[in-house]
Amino acid sequence: QNFAGTKLKALFEACGLEHGDMDIYHRHEQSDTTSPVQFSVASAVEPGTFKPEDMPALSTPGISFFMSMPGPTNSMQAFEFMLETAQCVVRNLGGELKDERRSVMTPQTIEHCRQRIREFERKQRSPRQ
């Protein structure tokens, strides 16, 4: 079952995402689009874009949530917002939440993601050798 563009657009906007750069949706740290991006959402179908004028006719089998590090001021907070938004899509529109290897996300997978973020931030803070 595919996701309808109009339903995705309404849900993304309700979750505070803005259409922007690269024709995809982004969640910014502040309500203005000049603040750092916490995470982004793209269509799983090439080219991955969500053009506003195409949303009424859009139908996609999947969407990808992703974040870049370094990027957000608080990476863990950005991850939690991204996870909550992805879970909101599943609750409201169906589908399954999967990881970067396309395996179903479990509480253990989610905790592993958090550990990877903590490790990345620890390395960013440690003095360079």
Language-model features: locations:
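Short glycine-rich or small-residue beta-strand-to-loop segments that form or flank ligand, phosphate
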Residues: 1, 12, 64-70
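Generic detector of leucine side chains in alpha-helical contexts
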Residues: 8-11, 17, 58, 83, ...
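Well-ordered alpha/beta subsegment
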Residues: 65-129
